[in-house]
Amino acid sequence: MSALAGPKIAKIIAPKKNHQKISIYTFGEPRVGDHHFNSVLEASVPEIYRIIHKHDIVAQIPPPGMTPFTKSQYFHHKTEIWYNNDMTEGVPFMICSKKNECDETFVKTHANINDHLTYFNLQNSIE
């Protein structure tokens, strides 16, 4: 699922009464909303997870802080599941329940697109 679908999903499920049964898992999701958006999303869908592969650069954009074009700040919703490895079956991962907790482990000089293009040994394409 594309992270760009997040706002649409939030609009669809917000008025529903059974939204507590929905779980969302994203892979390599960038920051997609401000504090208000994330608060509504987390209240609407308690089971929402961002799965991040090692040094996936897409998960780090837009950078934290005010963006010059929108004059907004973008944030991740919680909970992140971070794999600091090749994501093969049985490897350990870190669960970060606080916003930006796993971001502290991210080393900007190691950021790369290859980690975004491979999740659980499945190669994605930008073609």
Question: Where are the regions a protein language model picked out?
Answer:
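Non-catalytic, mobile gating and regulatory segments of ester bond hydrolases
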Residues: A3-E127
